[in-house]
């Protein structure tokens, strides 16, 4: 049941990270250091450590188009964050290590099945990159207080995806 709950987050996180990576690549060609600022804000270990962001560089940035690093960032980082803070209802989802492992294992299988689909639409999404999808993704992983509000995230994200193709 836990794995099923995280599936929508996995889908939207994957699409959001594709869009974010495209946005980073576009901005880094014009503005030096903009990609460093964007990606260091995604590192949950660096939330309260400004020196971590200053020491980061684009060469150290995770490759979000790589499925393995994407799964690691999207699902294991919230688990590490949960060890520090149990606020915002995440602790109720990852109540123990076994449920966390079931969730992450199911999510990895789910994301692997999405890789073929994402390749088909990747070019179109990159042409219409929308960094705000990343905010929806982070809300689903960190800020969400009740899993009943996942429907709001679904509708909002679907609307943004439709905008890609208009």
Swiss-Prot record:
Query: What are the subcellular locations of this protein?
Result: Membrane
Q: Where are the transmembrane segments?
A: 4-24, 101-121, 146-166
Q: Name the keywords, alphabetized.
A: Membrane, Transmembrane, Transmembrane helix
* Organism domain of life: Eukaryota
Q: Name one GO cellular component term.
A: membrane
* Membrane topology, record value: Multi-pass membrane protein
- Does the entry feature the keyword Heme, yes or no? no
UniProt keyword NADP present: no
Extra info from the record? Partially overlaps NCB2.
Task: Provide the protein name.
Answer: Putative uncharacterized protein YDR396W
